[in-house]
Amino acid sequence: MMKSAILLMVSCVFMFLVVSYIQDVEGANKRCHLNQMFTGKCGNDGNKACLGDFKNKRFRYDLCQCTDATQISPSLPPQRVCNCSRPC
C-alpha cells in the first residue's frame, strides 16, 4: 500500500514537471518575423548588415538571415532579402 502511494506521488510530481517544461518551451519559441528587401549583396557579413538595416526600425530584431535575391534584370542593382526575428 505504501509503495503505491509513493509511486502515485512521484508520478504526479513528474507529470507536473513535464507540463511546466512544455509550457516554458512554447513560450520561448514565440518569435515575430519580418522579411524585407535591401539594395546590395549579402557578402561575408550579410547577417550583420541586415541587423544594421533593421536597427532604425520600431522594434529591436536580434536574429537575421541574409539571402541574395535573384537578379531579374542586369540593369537593376543587386538585391538581398533580410529575414529577421525578435521575441514577440
Swiss-Prot record:
Keywords, comma-separated and alphabetical: Antimicrobial, Disulfide bond, Fungicide, Plant defense, Secreted, Signal
Top-level lineage group: Eukaryota
Keyword Signal part of the UniProt annotation: yes
Disulfide bond residue pairs: 32-88, 42-66, 50-82, 64-84
Keyword Disulfide bond in annotation: yes
Family membership noted in the UniProt record: Belongs to the DEFL family.
Protein name: Putative defensin-like protein 228
Organism of provenance: Arabidopsis thaliana
Gene: SCRL3
